[in-house]
Amino acid sequence: MALSTMIYNHLPTTSQPIMNKLPKIHGLAHQQVVRDPPQTKTSNRVSSLTESLSHLLHLHLETPPRTNIHQINWNLYGEEKLSTPTTSPKEVIAQNWHDMHASSNWESLLDPLHTWLRREIIKYGEFAQATYDAFDFDSHSEYCGSCRYNRHKLFETLGLSRNGYKVSKYIYAMSHVNMPQWLQRSKLAETWSKDSNWMGYVGVSDDEETRRIGRRDIVVAWRGTVAPTEWYEDLQRKLEPTGHGDAKVEHGFLSIYTSKNDSTRYNKSSASEQVMKEVTRLVELYREKGEEVSLTITGHSLGGALALLNAYEAASTIPNLPVSVISFGAPRVGNIAFRDELHQLGVKTLRVVIKQDVVPWMPGLVFNESLQKLDDITGTLGWVYTHVGAELKLDVRSSPYLKRGLNWLGFHSLETYLHLVDGFVNTTSTFREEARRDVALVNKACDMLVDELRIPHCWYQLANKGLVCNAHGRWVKPKRDPEDIPSPHMQENINVPALEAGIQTQDVLKPLYSV
């Protein structure tokens, strides 16, 4: 079965008494802006891998009986949902933010999934989704590989302006790494950059959101790229030392994170150097004001891997900074020593995974953390990949809105993840009937929704696929607004007073996310 080559795409454990302190709540999602779907191509290896991988990983792709799923009257569904708001008030979680930020590794908060934590997971998932929704996938555009909008317009354009955060800096990574299918390049000779891709952003909570969540939260969102086929084909499965003890990480991930070249416009400094410079600046800025500061890093797929590398560096560099990672469909990144160092540094990691998604099984499809049971015989194996942190495992079969059968792209889609988080209560219950997040978002870049919903697949795109009719009646690609054209000078010269003014707002924040 053919696959698309591209995908659109911290809380400690607490005791039961903590659960009793955290009241239950309800909430919902927001609307987003359109963008071009990524280009697709087929892989000759997919059909040969499908059956063997599904059997090997026990992905449970068969259609189960629907006796455990609440029945839906599809004739009434549309009318009922159209009259139901997709938002709800945000609760003040300031007194419990340490629990929501993994002071106890989210114990007693994941199964059943606490309502407040569900909201926070989806919030950070939406931050990661923004890196796909704003990305220019169009290989016929001179701006392919860049963000469509400047950082001041990003959240507003995507419908995220009321989430309580402002973007302070964009992150760029080298596109000439050793995994050619992982990053996007324009087919045109004259482009905004021949060497770099937009890989995410750094943001910070405004005053109103800071009061609600109990601290000044810095967020870093990393963009993912490839579909499951390229994970299998392109991963070099080569562990490389991080420079600290015995810790090693996958070579390709480290290359994207650390590569730079003085001859480039956007990567005279690496993605690592860019993000750490900005995070350090923000931490110092708000600590000088006497504020408590946290760092939350998020990403999907490849973005989840980069988030873990970023967390490792931040925790190693900035003393006493609470660092958490919330990742979606992320692969294994490093060896056991890398995992242990993250633990010693105090990094809290929550991995959201879908049982049928193959990417979290890679690299280390066969040789992974399961071999630790042999440590008494073999000793610690430094070449074995291992996952990090707590896991929230989801199942596509739990949702009555999702099709059954094999769909690698849909299983790995971030929107599928967010839909399942919104409906998850615990491992034994059915899909949450009161879930309000718009199910249409699932089909933004895949074909996962049941036909009864009448939502077209891959519907999320620019009007007329980005073409406009000019004064002469000809359909052409429009020029970007000058402020949306990537500029390394605009990127480097951040107006700090303007940023501070931008995050001081007295507007009452209205909810954008589901719970």
Where are the regions that the model predicts?
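N-terminal low-complexity, Ser/Thr- and acidic-residue-enriched intrinsically disordered segments
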Residues: 2-210
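Alpha/beta hydrolase fold serine-hydrolase catalytic domain that processes acyl esters and thioesters
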Residues: 2-5, 25, 84-88, 94, ...
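Short alpha-helical scaffold segments that flank and stabilize functional sites
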Residues: 128-131, 310, 314
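Gly/Ala-rich beta-loop-alpha elbow adjacent to hydrolase catalytic centers
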Residues: 299-303, 307
